[in-house]
From Swiss-Prot:
Pfam families assigned to the protein according to its UniProt record, in alphabetical order: SepRS_C (PF18006), tRNA-synt_2d (PF01409)
Key word Aminoacyl-tRNA synthetase present: yes
Enzyme nomenclature, EC number: 6.1.1.27
Full protein name: O-phosphoserine--tRNA(Cys) ligase
Amino acid sequence: MKFDPQKYRELAEKDFEAAWKAGKEILAERSPNELYPRVGFSFGKEHPLFATIQRLREAYLSIGFSEVVNPLIVEDVHVKKQFGREALAVLDRCFYLATLPKPNVGISAEKIRQIEAITKREVDSKPLQEIFHRYKKGEIDGDDLSYLIAEVLDVDDITAVKILDEVFPEFKELKPISSTLTLRSHMTTGWFITLSHIADKLPLPIKLFSIDRCFRREQGEDATRLYTYFSASCVLVDEELSVDDGKAVAEALLRQFGFENFRFRKDEKRSKYYIPDTQTEVFAFHPKLVGSSTKYSDGWIEIATFGIYSPTALAEYDIPYPVMNLGLGVERLAMILYGYDDVRKMVYPQIHGEIKLSDLDIAREIKVKEVPQTAVGLKIAQSIVETAEKHASEPSPCSFLAFEGEMMGRNVRVYVVEEEENTKLCGPAYANEVVVYKGDIYGIPKTKKWRSFFEEGVPTGIRYIDGFAYYAARKVEEAAMREQEEVKVKARIVENLSDINLYIHENVRRYILWKKGKIDVRGPLFVTVKAEIE
């Protein structure tokens, strides 16, 4: 808290040691929920896919390639121009875009009567007919239709939507009609379009890259395939090119991701947009794969493909220079870098069960439920803890004064007591601490047996006696406010977090159960606090 510098300068001149020790007084007593690990600075997390995309962007830029955005929605004629006779087989893998046709909407006398029944007023059909006519011609967008109908009929939007739904069923009967537009199934489709505009205008060599989505109509999604994926693709345009240029680009790019050795093999697929015998598979060795549980446990994986575009395909776009194209799937690279064996779990962790909370994440959500609201209340809680620690093993019956002082204008005395005979002031579990270890929550003593839980897990810093003391101090505060003369608070067997005045957010509790984890805080606390208020 704020302090007076002059006071401390004068105190230091008189007695530096005393001034130094007095420094503690500027540290305010904090609520237990404002103590670490419950207090911390949160930060966002990168998605592994987009983190890999960013690294790929930097890698391409570092070897002199410039970034472009290629067309994503393309006419199917481009696939036919690039693939020739193979086009139909390729188009079978493409998603075609469909649109809803704009219906011819007629306004009959019957429909006018229906509208008047809804609006409770006479309706002029001409302005309404004009709106539907403009909508049919494409002058009005569909999302503006209900607004404009409401405007000409002088009704609210809800009534306009009701009119469309009940009076004009032709809108509900519309069926999509396919167009000739497709979603790009691979980046090559976009490269031909891009290069057709710049290949004869920029100085050679032209070095471009693009990292963007492609869409492929797979039979279904599984551990290795999704309907949409990211392609990290580049082109090199020059008068003199060979397969060796592709090898050089592949090595320069992939070495930046930890790949160490490379093998190149002719691809048996022989796509028609590549010159024969130039389509090449790139195999690379990565030490992270060695000994893994995947089929790449020897460290080698097919990671990229390159080739030189065929002049028969380039000629369709009047591109007069050879073009080397290299591409790799970002998802495959990200799976290697982040250790995934299922692309669905990596791309859609929120859907495919890979949500992860660390022990620290869980520990941060374990909080004290009832907390004293005054500085005196916090001091009472601390006094209860100190008294319990000092006299925990004293034989009963026994009583120890923990605090005496003023609260809310009243004199308060707080005792830690045990009235039953032949026991101790505190039960055996009073010093158990709540610890999060490997996703589970435990209440355990700080002994050699449990050392690994404290060292490898995340201790919350809250013992059973701490949680109970805060609760007892809060009850003393409430008693003082209500002008009660006495209050007694007892703790017995602990079964749940709530028994020691702790709680955890329901979402985190569900996460632990979903992961088949456990919350085990059972133990005998047996502590009683009694307060006298005058």
